[in-house]
UniProtKB/Swiss-Prot annotation:
It holds the Pfam family PCMT. Belongs to the methyltransferase superfamily. L-isoaspartyl/D-aspartyl protein methyltransferase family. This is Protein-L-isoaspartate O-methyltransferase. It comes from Paraburkholderia phymatum (strain DSM 17167 / CIP 108236 / LMG 21445 / STM815) (Burkholderia phymatum). The lineage of its organism: Bacteria, Pseudomonadati, Pseudomonadota, Betaproteobacteria, Burkholderiales. Coiled coil: none annotated. Its EC number is 2.1.1.77.
Length: 327
């Protein structure tokens, strides 16, 4: 280094790289033992020049974080708030949605696009038409009502198959073909004002009837199913269904006479109280079981006069038993 360069750069490499202090050295200002600094060994071929890093002392600055939520709203939080939020996020959270009650995936949600599409219900309606259902009001009603909303999520993939499915309490939701057949028999091309359903179950058949009749009255004797039907029907906001908790064998004399009565459970006969609540010219459709309980037949009862009824036995079916009382 020349004299001129020495004046401009008075410090040499030996001034920048110094040996660490010994463990027993003391700080000149405080008189306390100095903390030794670790010495990192370098590989044999590495450069001996050590980088000089100057770390300024800067006071912490609280920065705000700008984030956007799902709806696009901008949220501004301080760094301390973000740290507190992170601590809270580590705490266990309770389940917030009804669909999180089980660890299993929700089939109704994962298959929502398929199940709620019009094409799926149209295929069901095509099968009904192929099976002999011809009343356009009934076909339109079956296409309108989302059956998957009335079954358990685990059975949602089977909602539009022609199958009876369990709904709890030893009860079932009837096959779509049976629902359509019974409603078509009850209507028979006539305008329906008041209709009575015995056995609400999950509420599906009442929802279909509501698309065909002006007013639908439905009776359920099992309280949990009565509550479930209300829950299922509430999102659909159907204004012309009136649910009742009571004994279906007694009927609903206060709302009689009815243009049609549909019974969704099989007794050994059709209760006389229900026959008398038919308007003259009205129809009642019900499954009737044999005395030995081995078979059931779909039966059509037509009221032809004040004290006259005509009975026709039609299709072999299978329903849960019709019982009296409430539970």
């Amino acid at each position: 280094m020349t004299g001129e360069r020495a004046k401009r750069f008075p410090l040499g490499l030996e001034d920048l790289v110094r040996e660490p202090r010994r463990a027993d050295a003391r700080d000149a200002k405080t008189g306390k033992p100095a903390v030794p600094k670790p010495v990192t060994s370098k590989p044999a071929g590495s450069s001996t020049r050590a980088p000089v890093v100057v770390t300024p002392v800067v006071k912490p600055v609280v920065k705000s974080a700008v984030t956007k939520n799902a709806s696009g709203i901008v949220n501004t939080k301080s760094a301390s708030t973000i740290r507190n939020d992170g601590a809270r996020n580590q705490l266990p959270r309770p389940a917030t949605a009804a669909f999180e009650r089980t660890g299993a995936p929700n089939v109704a949600l994962t298959s929502a696009v398929t199940l709620t599409s019009e094409r799926v219900r149209e295929r069901m309606v095509e099968r009904l038409r192929a099976n002999g259902i011809t009343d356009p009001r009934v076909l339109d009603a079956m296409a309108m009502v989302p059956r998957h909303m009335f079954v358990d999520p685990g059975l949602a993939t089977q909602a539009y198959e022609d199958a009876a499915l369990p709904i709890g309490h030893h009860q079932t939701i009837s096959k779509p073909s049976v629902v359509a057949r019974m409603i078509e028999l009850a209507a028979q091309g006539r305008t329906l004002n008041n209709v009575l359903e015995i056995g609400t179950g999950c509420g599906y058949q009442a929802a279909v009837l509501s698309q065909v009749a002006r007013d639908v009255y439905s009776i359920e004797r099992i309280k949990p199913l009565y509550e479930r039907a209300k829950t299922n029907l509430r999102p659909l906001r159907i204004p012309n269904i009136r649910l009742h908790y009571g004994d279906g064998r007694i009927g609903l004399p206060a709302a009689a006479p009815f243009d049609a009565i549909v019974i969704a459970a099989a007794g050994l006969d059709v209760p006389q109280a229900l026959r008398e609540q038919l308007a003259i010219g009205a129809r009642l459709v019900a499954p009737v079981g044999s005395q030995d309980g081995q078979s059931q037949v779909l039966t059509l009862v037509e009221r032809t006069g004040p004290a006259q009824w005509r009975e026709s036995r039609l299709d072999r079916v299978f329903f849960v038993p019709l019982k009296s009382g409430v539970i």
